[in-house]
Amino acid sequence: MGKIQELSPELINQIAAGEVIESAHSVVKELMENSMDAGATQMDIESKDGGLSLLRITDNGSGIDPEDIEPALKRHATSKIRDYGDLENVLSYGFRGEALASIASVSRLTLESGIKNQKTAWKICSIGGKISEKEEIPGFVGTKILVEELFFNTPVRRKFLKSVRSEDKKIRDRVTTQALARHDVRFRLFQDGKEVFVLPSRENKKDRIVDLFGENFRDHLLEVSLERGGLNATGYISDPDFYKSNRTGQFVFVNGRPVEIKYGSTLLKKAYDELLPPNGHPYCFLFFEIDPSRVDVNVHPAKKEIRFLDEEGFNGFFLTLIQKELRSSTPVSFLELKKRLLRPTPETFKTSSLYQAHSSSRSGESPLLSRELFTEVPRQEGFDLDRMGPGASLSALTDNVVKHSSFVPKKHFGVLFETFILAEAEDGFYIIDQHTAHERIRYEEVLRKLEKKNYGIQPLLTPIRIDVSKQEQEDILNRKKEYEEVGIFLDPLGEDSVVLREIPAYMEPGEEKEIILDFLNRTEGKETTEPELYDLMAKCVACRSAIKKGDHLSDPILAEILNRLSYCENPSRCPHGRPTLVKLSRDDLERMFHRK
């Protein structure tokens, strides 16, 4: 027998499933899209054990004709296309005819479907892609698909899946995205028998966004719309004071399909320009309509990436769509001034939802006050130990740290540009960034306290309420024990908020809310070990509590910062990897002046 043999249909389907079906959330995506194509206005999604034990999708769509029940489970069988012309103009979600066959090949699948004006419906069962049962059942209109024991016959695939909690999160994200695409459809999601959310059908996109992300989104959404050259776009973006520290709040749809656009996040960031801090990412919910012949949705097996016939033209359209609204909603004088100002690091949050954003200006400080607007600027008060608070105190060093031998400061000569400390050490001349240096100091201090659990808990005089969505509240409560490992005790308050009644002593009162919001944002949807939690919390505290660029420091504080930095394990980098200091040795200086 020859070495090259034709693969069996079952094996071909399993290989195809590897491209289309990544995990349970991929199954949910494919089946929801089929329901949408069938005209469903109501959809129930159920999962158990992250979708690996059970997935059930029930809809009230048009159903499948009896003669099409069996072909529906065959590969490359579809009702959407007949020739290449149909493929070029396809507007439906599922058109390749691979989804059901791929899902069936790696699971135990039961399909029930009925159509109008029929007394009976049909049920068909498949095990690993092979039909095991087919029978008539009492009639109904719609389709029910039950997927059990996903990847039962491909154990290697199952082994590489993440935890149940992670898979649950991916399913919720999939349903959320589909619910944004179709605000006119009612969605219900249940996981392990618990209702996650019920989304009634809505008349407009904004109400659906508010349903999913919280009522406090309503006042921070800017409506965008543009029609030009065969392209039409509508949707919402967040105002410049409303942003996240990651890109998880960005949703783009083309012809109703959730997609990833090449350079999409970069274009969005460019459109906001200097209205956002470097680590700020706006929310967007953008819906594009375009002639199907001008876009290729067939680039990726899962159809999540697309390609435009005129990429450059689309990119220009995208920028215009966003910038037009930002310019019209923000006074021109403010925009022009903002570009000339030194942006301060955000210190306060305007909102408290995980899906909400941070205020980009300091509390009690006008964003328009700049050194460029005045010839004389009053000198700021010098830092003192009391102002810096117990967590950031530069008082006595702990006994369990060792001085770092490579950076031993002898004296300092002041501060350049209210940012860079000039100092002499045993091995040369140093320029030290006061913010990143203090950030490194605070990071290592807090990390030591967390690792040794050497910190107290202090009650708050006034508990802090944090508004979240129902889904976010569930995520937080599921990780309650993890958060308590870093001294964060959050309790439910109603169905859409949590309350903070006490904080760890390594936090300075007044900054705890923004630190905790930052921490929750950074851990959202991530699997984290205890050391990783400590690292993330220490970074959040360090970032928020460190001395800022432009803060005036007294000579004793300067000396103490340098002394503290010399005791750090890694004095040359801040926790985020930026340099804290630059060294010029005596040899470097002599070579620069041609003395050597």
Swiss-Prot record:
Q: Report which residue ranges the record marks as coiled coil.
A: none
| Gene label | mutL
Identify the keywords attached in UniProt to this record, alphabetized. Answer: DNA damage, DNA repair
Family listed:
Belongs to the DNA mismatch repair MutL/HexB family.
| Name recorded for this polypeptide | DNA mismatch repair protein MutL
What organism is the protein native to? Leptospira borgpetersenii serovar Hardjo-bovis (strain L550)
Per its UniProt entry, which superkingdom is the organism in? Answer: Bacteria
Describe the task this protein carries out.
This protein is involved in the repair of mismatches in DNA. It is required for dam-dependent methyl-directed DNA mismatch repair. May act as a 'molecular matchmaker', a protein that promotes the formation of a stable complex between two or more DNA-binding proteins in an ATP-dependent manner without itself being part of a final effector complex.
Read off the PANTHER family from this record. Answer: DNA MISMATCH REPAIR PROTEIN MLH, PMS, MUTL, DNA MISMATCH REPAIR PROTEIN MLH1
UniProt cross-references to SMART domains, sorted A to Z: DNA_mis_repair, MutL_C
Question: Which terms under GO biological process does the entry name?
Answer: mismatch repair
